[in-house]
């Protein structure tokens, strides 16, 4: 049995299908959020990953925006700031596909499903390393939940080896070429990007526009790369 992490497929159902075909039946994938928006099959991918027993679906900032837009529509009967935020981030079609679900009770079921997604998860791997999984990553010692979904300011933070030597943080959220970190030149090389003395790793390959996705083995830290055909 292998345990993997993947993130930020953003509507790329084709890449999900490749990953699914690669997996053995007993494998598990922690999906670190942002299944929808921007890509061609966003709502379908959200439903598919949520319903897939091999995938542990964590919340991303796009799921959070979608839930807030759903709430505005169902409870206040209007498309407000939350909806506009979602649309500005590529979520117009995702929202419309959800809104076209027959019956308000079914719409509410999906709102509750996504609202209840976990924001952080810990996996202790075979080498007894604590692998902390969240959408955006963070620095140990920060406890604000918003960091787990939205943080983009932790890339050059110092790492306290004395207290956190046995921790690895796996995240997505910011496509690797867009990370504000020394040594990056804005070009994408498929795979995982390790930094912070190899205690943090970003696996967001910008799937929507690069056509790449990374599956990271959480025990061996081997990388498996998938690309559009």
Descriptions of predicted regions:
Residues 196-229:
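Binuclear metal-dependent phosphoesterase catalytic core
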Residues 42-121, 128-129, 157-158:
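Active-site neighborhood of divalent metal-dependent phosphoester bond hydrolases
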Residues 1-48:
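N-terminal active-site segment of His-dependent metallophosphoesterases
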Residues 10-14, 37-40, 64-67, 140-141, ...:
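Active-site environment of divalent metal-dependent phosphoester hydrolases
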Residues 6-7, 29-33, 57-61, 134, ...:
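Active-site neighborhood of phospho(di)ester-bond hydrolases with catalytic His/Asp-centered motifs
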């Amino acid at each position: 049995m292998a345990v993997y992490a993947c993130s930020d497929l953003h509507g790329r159902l084709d890449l999900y299908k490749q990953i699914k075909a690669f997996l053995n039946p007993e494998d598990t994938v922690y999906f670190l959020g942002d299944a929808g928006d921007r890509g061609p099959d966003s709502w379908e991918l959200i439903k598919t990953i949520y319903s897939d027993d091999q995938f542990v679906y964590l919340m991303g900032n796009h799921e959070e925006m979608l839930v807030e837009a759903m709430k505005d529509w169902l409870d206040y009967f209007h498309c407000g700031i939350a909806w506009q935020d979602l649309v500005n981030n590529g979520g117009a079609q995702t929202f419309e596909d959800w809104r076209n679900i027959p019956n308000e009770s079914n719409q509410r079921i999906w709102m509750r499903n996504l609202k209840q997604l976990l924001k952080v998860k810990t996996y202790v791997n075979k080498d007894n390393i604590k692998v902390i999984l969240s959408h955006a990553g963070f620095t140990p010692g920060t406890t604000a939940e918003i960091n787990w979904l939205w943080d983009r300011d932790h890339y050059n933070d110092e790492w306290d080896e004395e207290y956190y030597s046995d921790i690895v943080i796996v995240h997505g959220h910011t496509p690797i070429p867009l990370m504000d970190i020394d040594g990056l030149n804005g070009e994408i090389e498929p795979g995982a990007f390790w930094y912070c003395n190899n205690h943090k790793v970003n696996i967001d390959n910008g799937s929507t526009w690069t056509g790449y996705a990374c599956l990271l083995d959480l025990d061996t830290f081997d990388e498996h790369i998938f690309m559009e055909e």
